Structures are given as C-alpha cells and as structure tokens.
Swiss-Prot record:
It is an enzyme of class 3 (hydrolase). It is found in: Cytoplasm. InterPro entries: HisE, PRib-ATP_PPHydrolase-like. The keyword Hydrolase applies. The gene is hisE. One of its GO terms (molecular function) is phosphoribosyl-ATP diphosphatase activity. One of its GO terms (biological process) is L-histidine biosynthetic process. This is Phosphoribosyl-ATP pyrophosphatase. Keywords: Amino-acid biosynthesis, ATP-binding, Cytoplasm, Histidine biosynthesis, Hydrolase, Nucleotide-binding. The keyword Hydrolase applies.
Length: 108
C-alpha cells in the first residue's frame, strides 16, 4: 500500500468501528443505523455534488465534494464488509486493459 491507500484504509477502519455504535455517537453510526437506503441516498447526493462541482470547474470544490463521495462510498463498502483492497484489486485487474476490451469482456 502507499500513502493514498493508507488514508482510505484508515478512514474505512474508523467507519467499521462505528458500524455497531449507537446512532447518536457519530454521523457515521447514524448512517448505519438508518440503513442501506439512507447510505445509498447519501452516495447519490454526493455523486451529484461532484458533477455540479465538476461543471463549475473550481478545483477546491471538486476536491471537497470528491472527498465526500469517497467517504460515503467507503460507508457503502463498510455496510457490505467490502474492503477498499477489493476495489484496488479490481482496478489493478483492469489496469493496462483497453476500456473497450474490458467492457466487452463483461458481455461475454
């Protein structure tokens, strides 16, 4: 792992620690308590905010909103006990493969 992986893993571990906590103890615990529909709603909201920030073209806003999207995506992964390493491995599998070839392989 490198420094980028480490911060995502560190955040993920905190998220998992809060998974079984009382909802009033943290924002993350409250998301888990509200269930998958609330988590998915937040991921969708944050994705929309990234799109809006991207359209606006302001670097700071894009970075800020992308951080929110990554956080909420990690909560989604945590809900299903999917480690960030699983996503990294999928990206590594795709790396160096043409996007067209990768997409075609999914249709086989």
């Amino acid at each position: 792992m490198n420094e980028r992986d480490d911060i995502l893993q560190a955040v993920y571990e905190v998220i998992l620690d809060r998974k079984g906590a009382l909802p009033e103890s943290s924002y993350t615990a409250s998301l888990f308590h509200k269930g998958i529909d609330k988590i998915l709603k937040k991921v969708g909201e944050e994705a929309t905010e990234v799109i809006i920030a991207g359209k606006g073209g302001k670097r700071e806003e894009i970075v800020y909103e992308t951080a929110d999207l990554l956080f909420h995506t990690l909560v989604l992964l945590g809900h299903y006990d999917i480690a960030p390493a699983d996503v990294y491995n999928e990206l590594r599998r795709r790396f160096g493969t043409s996007g067209h070839a990768e997409k075609a392989s999914r249709n086989e």
